[in-house]
């Protein structure tokens, strides 16, 4: 994969976080932001460097990055989101924000979408489903970490509309749990930019 033109050109040295100029006036300087995710947050086709590393380099964000490619929201796999949420983040770190990637892997691995629970239900979620796992994350972050949190969506070719359906459900859960949504999937400016710069994406999901 790494021999492809998109990988080589998109990961040219000029695009490394090392080449970014630090902005001391950024409102994010010194903020502590935790990231939980999979391949996009890791930088799977970008030599392990993602937007998280650019936030650290350009804006002086103090990042904690828990990422394993191919992992899912749903389930209790040792490498999965729910287990890493417990093991990789500490209340003593006093995060300013927690950001969770809305994984594209749940559909790919055949995880059940599940159903949203009533507005007054705050425990006992079916964590073997994607929506149940999301609600467990929503319960856990305020309880364990006591900070605001947000989910971000990914780019993906989605002819079956399964990821789009998950995003629709995410917005419904936002009303219950009060988290932010950074919606890249529906961001027309980003879609136009990646179309104009094909080497910016290795495939439909992963940036270079």
Language model: regions and residue ranges:
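Active-site segments of SGNH/GDSL-like serine hydrolases
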Residues: 101-105, 135-169
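A general structural detector for well-ordered alpha-helical segments in enzyme core domains, enriched
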Residues: 51, 84-85, 130-137, 166-170
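Proline-centered loop/turn at the N-terminus of a beta-strand
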Residues: 62, 148-149, 180
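Conserved SGNH/GDSL esterase-like catalytic core that processes O-acyl groups on lipids
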Residues: 29-35, 40-123
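Catalytic His-Asp segment of secreted/periplasmic serine-dependent ester chemistry enzymes
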Residues: 154-208
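Membrane/wall-proximal cationic-aromatic binding patches
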Residues: 3-35
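A short acidic, glycine-rich active-site loop
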Residues: 119-130, 204
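A generic structural signal for well-ordered alpha-helical segments
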Residues: 55-56, 141-142, 173-174
